[in-house]
């Protein structure tokens, strides 16, 4: 019922073992439509549905990681010595870089790491990423900084299939 009328997926995983406890994809369809004389017609109807009920979004959908990415960023910036737990960045309802603006919600400013994680401050982690990309003495150039950042992301499992036995799993 939680996903009724919504598009997306929910997966609950046991952190200690990686066991999948629950997996839901929405919208779904009545599996009885795929049996009987009308299954071909029903499949065609479902495949043309713009909401894509045949797509199992839990294993085949590709989504930006959103706020789940922030602890990963924090670990990267800490490991690289770019921030400490006490490092503060301003947040004026977001982060601006040229014409790009990453919005954030209202909270105290400036903000340090723990409150930034607790409030999911977009500006804090954008500032950290900007600091990493701008550290030319440390990395030489932006490309080297980006490669180093990507190495951290790969080491933490981002960008790759989980390797489950589920059909249709995508990177």
Predicted regions mapped to residue ranges:
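Beta-lactam-recognizing serine transpeptidase/beta-lactamase-like catalytic domain environment
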Residues: 8, 12-68, 72-171
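Short loop/turn motifs at secondary-structure junctions and domain boundaries
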Residues: 2-6
